[in-house]
């Protein structure tokens, strides 16, 4: 695979870890017994085609509305796409706005790699076909939402028979979060509920496959940055433990968001 690194996390379940600029968000694949479920579709059709080519895909899940997890939807012809009701509405509105802005930006920028320009030109947003409110079962896979934390509506996939949690952007591994569309206190509450689930393997929305300790580390990150914003404001220094995390500009960006809300 060119755009993902495939890692088996259980019998019949794989993490697709983003490995190129055309696939910046992780995805997941679950064999439901002769048909495949794909969890999140990355942000470009060219990357999503790698996922679609791994088996007969019957179901696609959109965990939340951010484009790096849903703009590959269009390539899954014949599959049913599922999201929360709120996520579907946000894909229809917010993603459309952001995609239009990105295309306008590319028209006035000369230093963007041609493969990015071509990928963006190909995107045709596709909305989820079905919605759910709290929980949806796909046999061994339970699709659940506890409401909004990272965004106004976030879903995760729990393989109850294998102890695997596909957390999407509710949990990142050694990566700074994007908090700009989030609800931090609700997010912390969701993380506490996730910690109560039976899992040993964590597939994050960004970063490598991890485990329970990575959920603890990410919860500590949110707690620490909330405290830093409260005590020191937008210029709070980044703690040593987070300086080598991915998306290094995220600390300052998140502080700006948190202090700007006051």
Regions found by a protein language model. Give the residues of each.
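Hydrophobic/aromatic beta-strand patches that form the interior of the parallel beta-sheet core
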Residues: 14, 61-63, 80-82, 130, ...
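Active-site metal-binding motif and surrounding structural segment of the metallo-beta-lactamase
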Residues: 35, 45-83, 197-200
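Accessory terminal helices/loops
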Residues: 111-113, 196-201, 209-262
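Metallo-beta-lactamase
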Residues: 35-45, 92-220, 224
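Short acidic-hydrophobic surface loop/beta-edge motif
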Residues: 7-9, 30, 134-139, 204
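A generic, well-ordered mixed alpha/beta core segment in the N-terminal half of proteins
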Residues: 65-110
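Conserved beta-strand hairpin/beta-sheet module of binuclear metal-dependent hydrolase folds
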Residues: 4-51, 155-168
């Amino acid at each position: 695979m060119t755009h993902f690194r495939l890692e088996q996390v259980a019998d019949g379940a794989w993490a697709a870890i983003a490995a190129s600029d055309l696939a910046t968000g992780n995805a997941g694949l679950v064999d439901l017994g002769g048909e495949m479920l794909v969890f999140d579709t990355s942000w470009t059709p060219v990357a999503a085609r790698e996922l679609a080519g791994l088996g007969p895909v019957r179901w696609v899940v959109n965990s939340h509305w951010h484009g790096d997890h849903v703009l590959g939807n269009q390539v899954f012809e014949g599959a049913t796409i599922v999201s929360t009701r709120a996520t579907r509405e946000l894909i229809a509105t917010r993603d459309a706005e952001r995609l239009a802005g990105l295309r306008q930006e590319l028209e006035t920028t000369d230093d963007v790699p041609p493969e990015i320009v071509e990928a963006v030109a190909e995107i045709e947003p596709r909305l989820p076909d079905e919605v759910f409110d709290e929980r949806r079962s796909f046999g061994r896979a339970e699709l659940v939402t506890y409401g909004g934390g990272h965004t106004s509506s976030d879903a995760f996939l729990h393989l109850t028979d294998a102890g695997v949690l596909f957390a999407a952007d509710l949990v990142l591994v050694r990566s700074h979060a994007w908090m700009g569309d989030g609800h931090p206190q609700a997010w912390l509450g969701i993380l506490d509920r996730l910690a109560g689930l039976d899992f040993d393997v964590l597939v994050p929305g960004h970063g490598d496959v991890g485990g329970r300790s990575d959920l603890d580390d990410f919860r500590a990150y949110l707690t620490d940055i909330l405290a830093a914003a409260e005590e020191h404001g937008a210029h709070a220094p980044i703690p040593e433990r987070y300086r080598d995390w991915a998306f290094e500009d995220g600390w300052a960006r998140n502080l700006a968001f948190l202090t700007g809300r006051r």
